[in-house]
Amino acid sequence: LTAFAKAVDVITYEFENIPTSALDVLEALRPIHPNRRALGISQDRIAEKDFLTGLGLTTAPYARVTGAEDLAGAIAGIGTPAILKTTRLGYDGKGQARIMTPDDAATALAAMNGAEAVLEGFITFSHEVSVIAARGQDGSVSAYDPGENVHRAGILHTTTVPAKLTPSQRTDAVLLAARILNALDYVGVMGVELFVTAKGLIVNEIAPRVHNSGHWTQN
């Protein structure tokens, strides 16, 4: 890592499933964008939701789950249907189990294979959109028009641009993304997934990269 850092001027990364310990070594040698804090938050679902709700943004109701007792309490508080997810390394529907009734709890917990998990309540939404936004070292923020996402079997199938949004929803989505970028003192490109609901926009997740819903931006 030291040899690599000394051979370059700036360091970046293309996805979030890398150890933050590597950045601990590298950041002492070269600038890293996006920064370590952004990586640490985005790769842990609990840390991510704590950060987002700390900004006053809305997420799905959630609770940390480390065992059967935690899960029972979380279900009692959040209700069903809900979804149990590993806090780390889950993507494209992996590391997830639906809990339609409390009777599904034991099976869902077993599917986590002992990993720390988070229970998330189901959200009633009309559609999902994502904002691909970038922030420069000078603090300026720019964003592409939000795209509308359709998933099949937990995997992104299509992204259509522009998304079906009212002018105010479109503005709110971009401003929300900018708020996240600024709070992280972020430099680079980020994908922000949002649920469009009758009560407003709900943040699903953030990604410290050009999210797969933003691959169209290369064209």
Please tell me what each predicted stretch does:
Residues 11, 131, 193:
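Residue-level signature of catalytic and energy-coupling elements of molecular machines
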Residues 23-26, 133, 218:
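Short amphipathic alpha-helical segments
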